[in-house]
A protein has these predicted regions:
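Active-site region of glycoside hydrolase catalytic domains
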Residues: 37-38, 48-232
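N-terminal structural segment of carbohydrate-active enzymes
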Residues: 1-43, 47, 53-56, 60
């Protein structure tokens, strides 16, 4: 059944947004809409839809901020292991390349992935998000690594096809800890907790590798890293 029918009525929707003074709009591209099987043939109708949508945004004076992945992994890829499988990285790289190349003239602001922990740790460790699995720490850590590789491939695609002025970054849901008091001990404890909760992702991106503290903590459950992974 139809709901808001944005697929057919986006131009009306954007007119309403413009009338409210909205000048920026964050949206997500649906991976399965462009590649229904995840790594098969590109669906030209899907790409054409997003071109129409983005052109409409520009007509209404609204700047798009485009997210490449917001949790809608193609089911065919999930059935082959999902984020636990290295093949998902290869499929995402192709998706990112085709999407950025096909839409670069209409987009200047790109977001690679939305909230990595939600589709890795919560999805494959805690099990309260799709696909609802409860795997070992080693498997969860490998999903982190695969997500980081996808971030790297998306950044590379934007650098290759985005053109002058293109920007790209990650949306991450960091955990924040505030010290109870401003004593040196509490401040140090808050910093240590922040590092414990965040550096396996943010540290890996900014330091081009996993921190020694993280590797020592996880031990044998550390993700498998192949040569060149952190060269993206």
């Amino acid at each position: 059944e139809g709901a808001c029918d944005h697929y057919h009525r986006f131009d009306e929707d954007f007119a309403l947004m413009a009338s409210l003074g909205i000048r920026h709009y964050r949206l997500s591209i649906s991976w399965p809409r462009l590649f229904p099987q995840g790594d098969g043939e590109l669906n030209p109708a899907g790409l054409a839809f997003y071109r129409r949508l983005l052109e409409s945004l520009h007509r209404h004076g609204i700047t798009p901020w485009v997210t490449l992945f917001h949790w809608d992994l193609p089911q065919a890829l999930e059935e082959r292991g999902g984020w636990t499988a290295r093949a998902t990285v290869d499929a995402f790289a192709r998706y990112a390349e085709a999407t950025v190349a096909g839409l670069a003239d209409l987009v200047r602001h790109w977001i690679t992935l939305n909230e990595i922990r939600c589709f890795t740790w919560l999805a494959y460790g805690v099990g309260n998000k799709a696909p609802g699995r409860r795997e070992s720490e080693a498997v969860v850590n490998q999903t982190y690594h695969h997500a980081l590789l996808c971030h790297g491939h998306a950044v590379r695609a934007v650098r290759r096809h985005g053109g002058a002025g293109a920007q790209v970054g990650l949306t991450d849901n960091c955990d924040v800890c505030v010290p109870v008091t401003e004593t040196e001990a509490d401040i140090a404890a808050a910093r240590a907790w922040f590092a414990e909760r965040n550096l396996h992702l943010l540290g890996a991106i900014h330091a081009e590798g996993y921190t020694q503290a993280y590797l020592q903590r996880v031990g044998d459950a550390a993700p498998r890293v192949e040569p060149g992974d952190f060269g993206l």
